[in-house]
């Protein structure tokens, strides 16, 4: 059976050996050039291919059409991937009639993504395994063909677990490859509700934060022990690496990071104590703990830092452009609730953020992003995370001012995206549920749903396509230039401070604010085209909590992801929204200050929005990516959101001239 193989590392070598032993004909092998900065303790796929007289290639981009065509010319019947580090495109999968199969180092659906070997140790797991699964567009999500469990012993470190996994993989392939060859396999779909996903790890992820329990720090040491880069800490500005450790249930009142003793070298933790058995100062040699203490000048009572003293207290700097807006001001409140964020904000007004202006970790400048380009570039360079939230996002403006929508929403934001590329800063970009347009799927899915908009002579779509093109530009920068990004798509977030009643008076607001204005002024609630259009309304608190988790980015799980943030359970038509709002209004303690309800009035969209408008019948999100990447799901019922939003706006109204 002819096959093309994508392989790297020890797993790649043993996968190739297993294929040859099972009688497969390998037409070509695709691998990687070795990274000179990486300690190469593993076997070389390139050397093995050369020894076995098999053509071997290491292209920068195997998904390029030229390489796809070359692979097609090889006419593979089946494709295998063994620890190949790049995603392989659908076009390549489809070249093999029997499909493509990948070997993954975990018990899928747990620990999808990168570095599962290290992550299971970091998280203190007692079991892992290897999985052979069918390859699909989403990484590690295809049906399972075979699995083998591997126990993780308390004394296992990364290299010993690696050897166990290699042994298990060899067994699994010996058992399974003949069945694939004869088309005799049973595939089991993965349970998406059990899936977890982890991102790549870098050496900087292995800081030892002494306020954590000793068991957690010991697991970190195990996960990145030699030949991985090692867990590390600092004495002042002197970095040292911990190669092996032991947990001591030492009851001590010492501050975390304090040296309890130097022989053995025992460090107080948030819970218990960690003995540093072996370690290394700087780029020196490995030595046992008490000698390391002497080398570092440690005595009982010395304090260790998780990072150099000069940066130990630096907060993550978050730049929010459009900080006075609905999302911006609520996000600022959530970030400042923690003690490890510094927020820098720009906007043309400050009414919604006045409560933060005296906060020591909030820095605000009043200005326009189209004018203050130098300030913005400087702060993109200065900050760690950038959220460009400035946009015209009210439907009436799409038909009333389409060019202004394009200039602000697309052109100004493109400049900010390019700053992030230039200075290698992480960008969290607010796309929109509008990008799905007139998609007919029951649930709008980030990875599979088609994005469908109307004809060019319907300017209503200029917002949608401006956002969609920016999404595609960001994605391309991520693929080609390594931009660290996450795209999030809010689905009808609502709550206090959504627009304002003055904006609603000129029609430039979202639906609920417009409806509240109608109730406050005693004017009819206008139902555009009957108000039958359905939306899924999401409480701002749920939305902001998801966005906060994106900023936190635990395990880099959000990198390169597109994430819907919405509440599919809170689906209602605009008419139903109006009825729920009216019922809440009639029960409100301030109701007697306002005019009688003037009823509902059906109006045509062309009369309300003007020429060139089209509406969407439904818009319901799939939130699988939010579950997978954020461990998030919305919790707040729509009625509670309506009640709180209405209460907020009614209490902003000057009641002196209202009837009583």
Swiss-Prot record:
UniProt-annotated binding residues for NAD(+): 347, 368-369
Annotated catalytic residues: 104, 434, 619
Reactions catalysed, as given in the entry: UDP-alpha-D-glucuronate + NAD(+) = UDP-beta-L-threo-pentopyranos-4-ulose + CO2 + NADH; UDP-4-amino-4-deoxy-beta-L-arabinose + (6R)-10-formyltetrahydrofolate = UDP-4-deoxy-4-formamido-beta-L-arabinose + (6S)-5,6,7,8-tetrahydrofolate + H(+)
SUPFAM superfamilies: FMT C-terminal domain-like (SSF50486), Formyltransferase (SSF53328), NAD(P)-binding Rossmann-fold domains (SSF51735)
Signal peptide stretch: none
Pathway(s) this gene product operates in, as recorded in its UniProt entry: Nucleotide-sugar biosynthesis; UDP-4-deoxy-4-formamido-beta-L-arabinose biosynthesis; UDP-4-deoxy-4-formamido-beta-L-arabinose from UDP-alpha-D-glucuronate: step 1/3; Nucleotide-sugar biosynthesis; UDP-4-deoxy-4-formamido-beta-L-arabinose biosynthesis; UDP-4-deoxy-4-formamido-beta-L-arabinose from UDP-alpha-D-glucuronate: step 3/3; Bacterial outer membrane biogenesis; lipopolysaccharide biosynthesis
InterPro entries (alphabetical): Arna-like_SDR_e (IPR045869), Bifun_polymyxin_resist_ArnA (IPR021168), Epimerase_deHydtase (IPR001509), Formyl_trans_C (IPR005793), Formyl_transf_N (IPR002376), Formyl_transf_N_sf (IPR036477), Formyl_transferase-like_C_sf (IPR011034), Lipid_A_modif_metabolic_enz (IPR050177)
Residue ranges of the region described as Dehydrogenase ArnADH: 314-660
Family recorded in the similarity comment: In the N-terminal section; belongs to the Fmt family. UDP-L-Ara4N formyltransferase subfamily.
Protein name listed in UniProt: Bifunctional polymyxin resistance protein ArnA
Organism: Shigella flexneri
